[in-house]
């Protein structure tokens, strides 16, 4: 898809649009659903800097070991495997450096395109493109704050406490900041 060539913000938009069968025909939904975050990892030295800055302490004061090669990388963050000082195996999610600037710039472009579609394309207003982009803006910007994601995860864990059907990993709230989240592996 052309959205992949435009970068991670547009890929995330396409992924979000894949759930909007009320707005697009099935053939579009099927194509949007194929979008993946094919994003290379960012430099592990930057990940370490972000972790140390967020936690306000050296990496090895928190972790017994930290795998500098990420387990996974996506458009918003990447994930590293680590072991806490107490021996617990964890994953460390780290938000990409400068991703908020990139996303805000891309959203400005999306808003301009949405206004053009709404105002100049026949039937464009039916798709409500400005509304879709505004909703997307709220959603993607909230994804950048890992404290919110951690709080949602903790609520989910409480909701399913005692369940044999679903297991929600423990989140180490003492190691959660806007840009990092540490959770059970």
What are these regions (language model features)?
Residues 1-185:
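Broad phosphate/nucleotide-binding scaffolds in NTP-utilizing and phosphate-metabolizing enzymes
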């Amino acid at each position: 898809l052309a959205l992949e060539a435009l970068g991670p913000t547009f890929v995330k938009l396409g992924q979000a649009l894949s759930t909007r069968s009320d707005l697009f025909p099935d053939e579009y939904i099927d194509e949007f659903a194929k979008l993946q975050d094919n994003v290379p990892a960012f430099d592990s030295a930057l990940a370490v800097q972000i972790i140390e800055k967020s936690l306000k302490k050296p990496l090895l004061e928190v972790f017994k070991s930290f795998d500098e090669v990420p387990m996974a990388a996506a458009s918003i963050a990447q994930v590293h495997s680590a072991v806490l000082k107490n021996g617990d195996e964890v994953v460390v999610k780290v938000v990409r450096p400068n991703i908020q600037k990139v996303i805000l710039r891309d959203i400005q472009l999306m808003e301009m395109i949405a206004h053009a579609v709404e105002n100049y394309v026949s039937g464009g207003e039916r798709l409500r493109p400005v509304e879709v982009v505004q909703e997307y803006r709220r959603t993607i910007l909230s994804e950048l704050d890992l404290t919110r994601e951690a709080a949602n995860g903790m609520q989910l864990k409480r909701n399913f406490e005692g369940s044999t059907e679903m297991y929600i990993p423990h989140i180490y709230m003492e190691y959660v900041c806007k840009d990092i989240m540490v959770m059970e592996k």
